[in-house]
Amino acid sequence: MVFLAGFLYFGMQPQTVEANSSLILEAPTINLTSPIRVIELNDDYTLTSPDRITGLYKAATNNIFLIGHSTTIFSNLKNLKIGDRLTLDNKNYVIKTYKIQKKSEISMSKVLEAKLTPTLTLMTCHGEKISGHDYTERVIITAELEK
């Protein structure tokens, strides 16, 4: 999936890779346990989402952005609910927001902006398939560090 949003041109193309960190994302309510691959912006300002594991992009202060394909590792992400818990690096986060948005209405600069409290922002494709790995909507979930 590819879209232009603010200063960031964001794309997710399948790429089979191994984890490059010891981090594990867990979402017990959907039986998700995923290794993490830390990713960086490509030269063309895109992000490449790894296939079958979660990609982690350190977006801004207190905002860890996690992406994964809806046909593989994030296939059940749509089943999470507000109040469900996620774990990353032995820290517990509680889901505070759950949105399904049209791709054309997403402001990536807002999704990736700095947060006041430590936050995980998860995103995956949703809706009708347009072409290849591109869909009409995105599931965007934010979870804040449990106090």
What residue ranges belong to the model's regions?
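Solvent-exposed, non-transmembrane regions of membrane-associated and secreted proteins
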Residues: 2-147
